[in-house]
């Protein structure tokens, strides 16, 4: 396989149009079409479906796209590694963060430390759901992601970071420092969608106790959730880091769910299909050192060994 053809193919799939891809790649469309035809001949498979609206990958094309992104990324990392021997690390490092994770507390320390220690490295931070972040890792669009993990994901390597207890957060009728799950079942709740690790843990706990949650709304945005809780319409369940942040913003209270005790594991995820670039590895070490500090936002969290 020719690396240039793979690069062309990935760009076509990313854009979804041969014409636009040809413009971006500065190559004539007939020549680009010939490169695709040659690649399809090498694979002995049709890779693209051409329609009036553009092009979409076939099943074989989707498989090649995934592998091609990994191959191109590894080639880029290899070149960077060679170029950086004896030189200052430089380049971009992309990190995904799940909303409401403890990692949010180290965002500014991370940016400041990288700026001080790796001045030529640009950190790109993206916030999204855990499922979306894993998909981006597999697609080669992120170097690493910090999220609450529910179960192993094929193609993903997870490094446990710490555990956080779950807290009930609200602004009306504070139950005290701790609360029983039966009391939570009587409250109106705002929770994330069912693919969220928090939602899955809450659902599991309610099912085991044969209780039903009174969910009055599903909210993904922390900003919207803060406004909803501040209004007094209902309460929510969050890991300690997110609970403390929302509690302060909404001028509310937080109570640890103690019967039963509930927690979530925070993990650093990376793709198993390739190694990190030198600059990404350096940023990873900084991130791990920050998360491993005894206190985040002046609170003790349970580190995972």
From Swiss-Prot:
It comes from the Bacteria. Residues 1-58 form the HTH lysR-type domain. One of its GO terms (biological process) is regulation of DNA-templated transcription initiation. Signal peptide: none annotated. PROSITE patterns: HTH_LYSR. InterPro entries: LysR_subst-bd (IPR005119), Tscrpt_reg_HTH_LysR (IPR000847), WH-like_DNA-bd_sf (IPR036388), WH_DNA-bd_sf (IPR036390). CDD domains: PBP2_Nac. Transcriptional activator for the hut, put and ure operons and repressor for the gdh and gltB operons in response to nitrogen limitation. Negative regulator of its own expression. This is Nitrogen assimilation regulatory protein nac. It comes from Klebsiella aerogenes (Enterobacter aerogenes).
């Amino acid at each position: 396989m020719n690396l240039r053809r793979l690069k062309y193919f990935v760009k076509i799939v990313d854009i979804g149009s041969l014409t636009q891809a040809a413009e971006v790649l500065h190559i004539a469309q007939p020549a680009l079409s010939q490169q695709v035809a040659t690649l399809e001949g090498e694979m002995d498979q049709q890779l693209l479906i051409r329609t009036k609206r553009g092009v979409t990958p076939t099943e074989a094309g989707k498989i090649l796209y995934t592998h091609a992104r990994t191959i191109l990324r590894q080639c880029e990392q290899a070149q960077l590694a060679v170029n950086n021997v004896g030189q200052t690390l430089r380049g971009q490092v992309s990190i995904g963060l799940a909303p409401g994770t403890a990692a949010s507390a180290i965002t500014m320390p991370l940016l400041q430390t990288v700026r001080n220690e790796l001045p030529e490295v640009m950190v790109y931070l993206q916030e999204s759901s855990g499922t979306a972040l894993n998909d981006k890792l597999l697609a080669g669009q992120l170097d690493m992601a910090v999220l609450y993990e529910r179960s192993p994901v094929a193609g993903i390597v997870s490094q446990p970071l710490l555990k956080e207890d779950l807290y009930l957060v609200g602004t009306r009728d504070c139950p005290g420092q701790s609360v029983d799950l039966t009391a939570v079942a009587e409250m109106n709740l705002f929770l994330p969608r069912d693919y969220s690790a928090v939602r899955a843990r809450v659902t599991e706990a309610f099912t085991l106790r044969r209780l039903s949650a009174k969910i009055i709304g599903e909210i993904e945005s922390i900003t919207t959730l803060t406004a909803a809780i501040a209004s007094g319409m209902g309460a929510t369940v969050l890991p300690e880091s997110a609970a403390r942040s929302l509690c302060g913003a909404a001028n509310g209270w937080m109570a640890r769910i103690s019967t039963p005790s509930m927690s979530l594991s925070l993990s650093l995820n990376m793709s198993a299909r390739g190694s990190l670039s030198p600059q990404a590895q350096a940023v990873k070490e900084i991130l791990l050192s920050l998360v491993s500090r005894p206190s985040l936002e002046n609170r003790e969290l349970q580190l995972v060994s």
